[in-house]
Amino acid sequence: MIEFKTKPFDYQLDGIEYGRHNNRWLLADGMGVGKSLQAIYIAQINKEKYNWKHCLIVCGVNSLKYNWYNEVNKHTDYSAYILGTRYKRSGAVKAGSTKEKLEDLLKIDELPYFLITNIESFRSVDFANKIKNLCKNKIKMVIADELHACKNPASQQAKGFLKSNPDYKLAMTGTPLMNSPLDLFIILKWLGYENHSFYQFKQHFCVMGGFGGYQVIGYKHMEQITDTLDMMMLRRVKEDVIDLPDKMYIDSYVDMLPKQKTLYYDIVQQIQEDIDKVILSPSPLASLIRLRQCTGYPGILSTSVNESAKLDKMEEIVKEAVSNGEKCVVFSNWTNVTKEVCNRLKEYNTATITGEVKDVDRTEQEKKFMEEDACKVIVGTIGAMGTGLTLTAGTVVIFMDEPWNSALFEQAVDRTHRIGTTKKVTVYSIMCKDTIDERIHELIYQKGKISEILIDGVKEKNKTELVNFLLS
């Protein structure tokens, strides 16, 4: 009888039992349900039942390496090791190079059961081939976390990762479909449920059209995707298995300040003058980023315009929340916006996590927010702080700007709304009235419908309609 160091919830025991009888599957429980504990205990069972030598955890998001390291130590008596770990003279941990990771794999028999690396390691052909060979006898189980983040089948890391073929494969994601069924291809391919090429997969499930017939304008045969997922996916959402406090969503609208408004419409005019170039560009949304930045913090774009209605509103929300004994989590898409947020919130002993913060320091910032009473606010980018962290000390979440899709939005919110949450979470989306902010707010909920894998042939707006919609 296996003894667990941390007692799982009943639904987690169900997941562990499912994993005992399936060796190629997708654990797609919603954010905050506790997927990592289930995966760790399945690996522990396999170790103690079959005397397997190693389980490799591959992180689709690099910063998750340290979360997994802490989770293994927290929930088991086994040790974990991040491949390539080396120390500076100061004692600080430094990220390992491919050479150092390969050196570690040469002495794999001396390493602990749980090995951890990031998906980018597989960009190295030597590393990918080494893992492929080790999967024959040493590495009998691979856990691939946030595998949906590996989207491009033509990339070197995808090709390298797909070579790994251990006895037991467990893919994990809280968001099995982000923007389209194409995001599932690598997951299905690795688990052995898809034998066709990416081109064939795309032709079968996508409706092609638009300029030259190369644009995906919709989806078809979605019932086949659903049937496949039913065979190999276990998914429970928080609302079904955990009695958590409610989430309250508040759309907070502000009017742009005079100079801010002038700059905004100057940018709109510039875009409209080059509208054909924008529409024909590979990524028209990128051309509109300046508008989004202007509604957040115009100082990114102009040395003479620093006023921001959204920043003023954010300060107001934080001040009220902190006075009521609450902690706040503030998100933005852009590091420059987070820096200005931090400048305005210095009095709250702010923690921060952006792409500029080293992975090893992110855990310290997370710990600061969770454990220090004096730290009232944590500020970060959606890309760096929106996954893999537990921020349940926060009960107020503020979006200075929203991501392009609803899955990323909910993923970020669920840093606070997960196991351990004891209070209601209030989520503010601050938007400038009559601007691109409102249009994106509408857009992410429209795209969210696609992510539910329910409707056959949902059509996306073509580029012209999309740009005109966002500028309207």
Segments from the language model and where they lie:
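Conserved pre-motif I regulatory segment
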Residues: 1-28
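Conserved motor-coupling elements within RecA-like helicase/translocase cores
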Residues: 92-115, 361-376
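SF2 helicase/translocase ATPase core recognition
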Residues: 164-201, 241-268, 376, 380-462
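Conserved Helicase C-terminal RecA-like lobe
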Residues: 1, 30, 34, 38-50, ...
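Conserved P-loop NTPase motor "coupling/switch" region that bridges the ATPase
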Residues: 53-54, 74-80, 86-103, 107-110, ...
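Conserved helicase motor
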Residues: 83-100, 119-124, 149-154, 332-336, ...
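Inter-lobe coupling linker of SF2 helicases/translocases
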Residues: 116-122, 128-138, 151, 156-167, ...
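Conserved Walker A/P-loop ATP-binding site and its immediately adjacent core
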Residues: 52-74, 180-183, 333-334
